[in-house]
Amino acid sequence: MIPEERRKNILIKLKENDFLGIEELASELNVSKITIVRDIQILKSSGLIEKIHGGIKLNEKSAGDFESRFFVRMQNNYSKKVEIAKKSLEFLKNKDTIFLDSSSTVFVFAQEIFSSSVEERNLITNSPAILVEALNKPNVNLISTGGELKQEFNIFGGNWVNEFLENLNIDAAFISAAGISSNLDITTNNKDLAGILETIFKKAKEINLLIDSTKFYKEGMLSIAHISDCRRVITDKEISEEVKAILIKETELII
């Protein structure tokens, strides 16, 4: 069982039980105690669970329909997101004002920024999760777009956000997407996010697309831009040779 599936199973079990012991989980999932402890650390840092003596319980604030929640989506292909985030750090160099979108992949990138020794930057975001993560972090000057909070999707949206972004000068944007279509369109399923990203493509001097290899040839409801409009695409090493050959004709590819 891959780590992402195992963590989902842990959350499902917690939905059915008020408390789960670490040794009990290790036995049921047929993995070592060390592996379970590592899973618990990731889920705890995501805000999904609380660690208590001898085990864990579901975080009451995330006890709703967690299958659709942002922090559960973050667990999908989590190792790929971390790989992509670490590669993306080098592209912060000489950039003063950065936009970070509200995707789970970019949230992982934000975590890497906050835990690194990069110089202080102006970070602009429409992500409530990134705002919370940035509390008491010394190397960022964080600017929120404000707007209407859509908790289920971890997004500040609405016309206010677009109007706010129109007045900014952005050196670089780091974004993700629901999928890349067969025509190499960058797509999303969220109307608010589509409008925001369309504005970002107009305003940012440089677009960095952070997207894992499972998203290629997956098509969302709304097209935002073509992949050639990105300065670079940063993905994981499991990208197919076919997709790789196509992308390098359109933009810089970082693997």
Model-found features: residue ranges?
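HTH-adjacent hinge/linker in prokaryotic transcriptional regulators
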Residues: 2-5, 9, 15-23, 28, ...
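Conserved phosphate- and dinucleotide-binding cores of soluble alpha/beta proteins
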Residues: 5-12, 19-25, 30-32, 44-45, ...
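Short, well-structured alpha-helical patches and their helix-loop capping segments
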Residues: 2, 76, 80, 101, ...
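Distinct, well-ordered alpha-helical segments
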Residues: 113-114, 221
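Conserved H-X4-D acyltransferase segment
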Residues: 95-110
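Short, well-ordered alpha-helical scaffold segments within catalytic/effector domains
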Residues: 81-89, 106-107, 162, 194
